[in-house]
Regions:
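A charged N-terminal "starter" segment
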Residues: 1-141, 180, 185-189, 222-223
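Short beta-strand segments
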Residues: 55, 142-148, 194-196
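Active-site loop/helix belt of alpha/beta enzymes
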Residues: 150-225
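Short glycine-rich loop/turn motifs that provide flexible caps or phosphate-binding loops at active sites
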Residues: 73-75, 99, 143, 161, ...
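Short acidic/polar capping segments at secondary-structure boundaries
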Residues: 102-103, 124-126, 148-152, 198-200
Length: 225
């Protein structure tokens, strides 16, 4: 984005011409910026080559999701609707993670029927329901368990999700209990430690503290994810 002779341009297209063609207000997305952000993320994590999952709740525009799919990324969804959009954008099921609180039985059944990569669970009750569905479906489902790392994200109080007093995620004690209880389950495979500490985080320090807490509990559990 830049100014040329007093006019604002987005990827060499003037904002004025966009407004004349589509009217205002109008949302404008930069493919160039999105692609550069993705490449930058991949570059910084190239030594471990992770599966990068785009948060569909941040932008469910199908054109954006189509681009995400073409670039080989996965998707993180929090509802059946988002899962359907991700699939419609040709994002491979084995690259889709279903996260979030309040998943319905219908949503869990749908996700399992689509053979997605992973379901991040928020409670023991959710694991119990997944086991029931898996038993009837004769499948073994990959799950994650959300851990509360008791980390201050240094963000707005109402969007903080990683402190002990927040309602999200499980305490260390509960997490270790569920890990032990379900590690030999015939119907769920604990494949992931899930964690989320908040939004609008402007410093790397909260992430460093979070990773220290995650590393500690993994070592204590002696479990190989």
């Amino acid at each position: 984005m830049k100014y040329k002779k007093g006019h604002f341009y987005i990827e060499n297209v003037s904002a004025e011409s966009i407004a004349k063609k589509f009217g205002t207000p109008v949302y404008v997305y930069s493919y160039e910026k999105i692609i550069n952000n993705i490449y930058n993320f991949q570059k910084n994590f190239k030594t471990i080559n992770p599966l990068i999952c785009f948060s569909v709740k941040s932008n469910s525009n199908l054109q954006i999701l189509n681009l995400i799919s073409k670039l080989g990324l996965g998707a993180d969804v929090v509802s059946k609707g988002e899962l359907v959009r991700a699939l419609n954008a040709k994002i491979k099921p084995e690259k889709i993670v279903f996260s979030g609180v309040g998943k319905t039985i219908e949503e869990l059944k749908f996700a399992i029927s689509k053979n997605i990569l992973l379901i991040n669970t928020e409670s023991e009750n959710e694991i119990v329901e997944i086991e029931k569905i898996a038993r009837k479906s004769k499948k073994k489902i990959n799950i994650g368990i959300r851990f509360n790392p008791d980390t201050d994200a240094k963000t707005l109080k109402n969007i903080s999700t990683g402190k002990r007093e927040n309602k999200f995620g499980l305490t260390k004690e509960k997490f270790l209990y569920l890990l032990k209880k379900y590690k030999n389950s015939k119907f769920v495979n604990i494949d992931c430690l899930s964690v989320h500490i908040g939004s609008q985080i402007t410093s790397h320090v909260p992430y460093k503290n979070m990773l220290n807490a995650v590393n500690k509990i993994i070592q204590n559990s002696k479990y190989k994810f």
